[in-house]
Amino acid sequence: MTLFFASMAYASGDSGHGPDWGNFAFRVVNFVIFAGIIWKAAGKKIVGFFTGRRQGIEQELNDLETRKTEAKKQLAEVERRIANLESERQAILADYRAQGENIKAAIIDKAEKSASLITEQAKRTADNEIKAAIDAMRAQMADEIIVAAEKLLAEKLTANEHEKLIDKYLTKVVLN
């Protein structure tokens, strides 16, 4: 409250000080001269600086807008790829399955051919073994027949008849 009354006391007093218009005019003239000198000396550079700065900002904004547009295009491309990723995955899997089925069919075909070749070879081997066994049996039977025939001839033929029979067959063999 004391401050309130003190401010009223000071406000009511006439101190006789008013604005010093001469000093103010001197300051304004001084500022105008100083601004004129600066404008005369560096006005074009200042204007060029602000104009260049303005153009630089405009160019930077245009570049940023271009980059923003390119980024949107790239984002759309990436989103499209992501959307197509599942279909691409399905296509790749289908391709690998088809290749697998082809390889499987080729392996089965090769195995069947090998099995048929092995079966055919086993049949030939069995046939050859049967023929060899039959030939061996025939040879053994021929030997046994010869032994039996010799025994029978030895019992029924005399030595003189035996000699005649040998000469007869030797003559046939030599003449033929």
UniProtKB/Swiss-Prot annotation:
Regions crossing the membrane: 24-43
Question: Membrane topology per the record?
Answer: Single-pass membrane protein
Q: Which GO terms describe its molecular function?
A: proton-transporting ATP synthase activity, rotational mechanism; proton-transporting ATPase activity, rotational mechanism
Q: Does the keyword Transport apply?
A: yes
**UniProt GO cellular component terms:** plasma membrane; proton-transporting ATP synthase complex
Q: What is its main location?
A: membrane
| Localization | Cell inner membrane
UniProt superkingdom: Bacteria
Q: Coiled-coil regions in this chain?
A: none
Renumbered to this chain, the signal peptide range is none
The UniProt entry, under InterPro entries, shows: ATP_synth_b/b'su_bac/chlpt, ATP_synthase_B_chain
Q: Which UniProt keywords apply?
A: ATP synthesis, Cell inner membrane, Cell membrane, CF(0), Hydrogen ion transport, Ion transport, Membrane, Transmembrane, Transmembrane helix, Transport
The UniProt record lists the keyword Transmembrane helix: yes
What this protein is reported to do is described as:
F(1)F(0) ATP synthase produces ATP from ADP in the presence of a proton or sodium gradient. F-type ATPases consist of two structural domains, F(1) containing the extramembraneous catalytic core and F(0) containing the membrane proton channel, linked together by a central stalk and a peripheral stalk. During catalysis, ATP synthesis in the catalytic domain of F(1) is coupled via a rotary mechanism of the central stalk subunits to proton translocation. Component of the F(0) channel, it forms part of the peripheral stalk, linking F(1) to F(0).
What family name appears in the similarity comment?
Belongs to the ATPase B chain family.
Subunit record text: F-type ATPases have 2 components, F(1) - the catalytic core - and F(0) - the membrane proton channel. F(1) has five subunits: alpha(3), beta(3), gamma(1), delta(1), epsilon(1). F(0) has three main subunits: a(1), b(2) and c(10-14). The alpha and beta chains form an alternating ring which encloses part of the gamma chain. F(1) is attached to F(0) by a central stalk formed by the gamma and epsilon chains, while a peripheral stalk is formed by the delta and b chains.
Q: What is the official name of this protein in its record?
A: ATP synthase subunit b
What organism is the protein native to? Nitratidesulfovibrio vulgaris (strain ATCC 29579 / DSM 644 / CCUG 34227 / NCIMB 8303 / VKM B-1760 / Hildenborough) (Desulfovibrio vulgaris)
Q: What is the lineage of its organism?
A: Bacteria, Pseudomonadati, Thermodesulfobacteriota, Desulfovibrionia, Desulfovibrionales
Gene that this sequence comes from? atpF
